């Protein structure tokens, strides 16, 4: 899935910011560079195809998440950390006939990688499989996180300029980054999503006025589609949906 997301990102047209958009992007980067943090975890995946023996694999992952409050509630795309969520319950066609896939993930050793290089132990607080969201929070009470303005939002409009605030990969020291682009499509069914011209998986997206629009998630093919391969496309999930789902966290 990572290679598909990277290929999609590289195929997007480049968008060079200038004038007021560049100024606002620089301002947002300074204000919210610590609102996007990496989450690390060890994930054990168990996969069973029909009556075949169960296959088990363990891997360490690092995924980007967006900070929602000062207490450290973080949201990230579920499909990037619970690697079985996109496969469980799917039916694949084989020469021997359709086979149903059963998959589950055990996510452990969850840590929030803080801007100063320290690690904070964390846990999964809620999974929203419909929206591809997972909410995480520190194991111990905290109040030192830098959240995005979850209540200061705006609707998505076609061809609106956008600003993405994120971080580079481990290989590039997880340095803060900012990118600009535009909303190239607004998808209204089966629910509202935006398609933007910049990669934003797990990252907060703002408009040119600094209003919070949402975060990038992965939109997967339906489990009832009958397709053998799990196709994924990165989309912008509106802030209102994130806030509604976050309100269920206890």
Tell where the protein language model's regions lie, with residue ranges.
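Sec-dependent signal peptide recognition
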Residues: 1-7
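Flexible, gly/ser-rich surface segments that form the specificity/activation loops bordering the active-site cleft
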Residues: 24, 145-200, 216-228
């Amino acid at each position: 899935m990572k290679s598909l997301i990277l290929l999609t990102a590289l195929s997007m047209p480049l968008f060079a910011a200038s004038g007021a958009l560049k100024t606002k992007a620089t301002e947002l980067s300074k204000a919210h560079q610590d609102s996007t943090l990496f989450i690390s975890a060890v994930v054990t995946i168990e996969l069973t195809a029909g009556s075949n023996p169960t296959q088990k694999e363990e891997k360490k992952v690092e995924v980007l998440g967006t900070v929602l409050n000062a207490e450290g509630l973080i949201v990230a795309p579920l499909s990037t950390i619970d690697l079985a969520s996109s496969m469980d319950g799917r039916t694949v066609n084989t020469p021997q006939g359709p086979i149903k896939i059963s998959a589950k993930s055990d996510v452990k050793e969850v840590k929030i990688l803080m801007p100063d290089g320290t690690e904070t132990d964390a846990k999964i607080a809620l999974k929203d499989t419909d929206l591809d969201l997972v909410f995480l929070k520190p194991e111990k009470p905290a109040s030192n996180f830098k959240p995005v303005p979850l209540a200061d939002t705006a609707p998505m409009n076609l061809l609106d300029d956008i600003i993405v605030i994120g971080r580079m990969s481990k290989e590039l020291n997880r340095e803060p980054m900012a990118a600009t682009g535009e909303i190239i499509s607004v998808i209204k069914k089966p629910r509202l999503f935006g398609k933007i011209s910049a990669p934003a998986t797990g990252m907060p997206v703002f408009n040119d006025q600094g209003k919070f629009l949402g975060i990038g998630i992965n939109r997967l093919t339906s489990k009832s589609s009958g397709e053998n391969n799990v196709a994924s496309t990165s989309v912008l999930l509106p802030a209102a949906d994130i806030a509604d789902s976050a309100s269920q966290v206890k």
